[in-house]
């Protein structure tokens, strides 16, 4: 599986300096002065084969956690969910790890890969499930 060197350190820098808040009632970023009203934070990265998206939010952002057909693992502080799927008849595959804390807040880490089939997409991934799970459980990703 291919890895992007320095990806984790680039992510840490992004968390520290370039997060943009979103509000459920607004489409897109809110003004920096209103950051305390944000209900979720999102950051996106483009890779050579797709994208990586990191989202974190309050429990009320989703109205309760739902994940049909997810693999579920209880871990310290919450539950990890894993799901692989395609939304466009197999042209793009999504590999998803979600961490739902005991208080209902969450972090989703998604990697999209364009490939003709799931195994081809899996072989091209830049971020492993273990890396995604560690990122989702990063204690800095909280309100």
Could you say what each language-model-derived stretch is?
Residues 1-143:
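Intrinsically disordered, low-complexity prosegments and terminal tails associated
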């Amino acid at each position: 599986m291919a890895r992007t060197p320095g990806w984790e350190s680039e992510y840490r820098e992004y968390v520290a300096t370039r997060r943009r808040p979103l509000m459920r009632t607004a489409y897109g970023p809110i003004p920096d002065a209103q950051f305390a009203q944000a209900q979720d934070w999102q950051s996106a990265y483009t890779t050579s084969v797709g994208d990586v998206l990191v989202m974190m939010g309050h429990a009320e952002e989703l109205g309760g956690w739902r994940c049909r057909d997810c693999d579920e693992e209880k871990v310290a502080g919450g539950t990890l969910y894993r799901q692989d799927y395609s939304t466009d008849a197999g042209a793009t595959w999504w590999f998803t790890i979600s961490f739902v804390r005991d208080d209902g807040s969450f972090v989703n880490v998604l990697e999209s890969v364009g490939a003709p089939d799931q195994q081809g997409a899996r072989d091209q991934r830049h971020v492993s499930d273990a890396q995604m799970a560690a990122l989702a459980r990063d204690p800095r990703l909280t309100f």
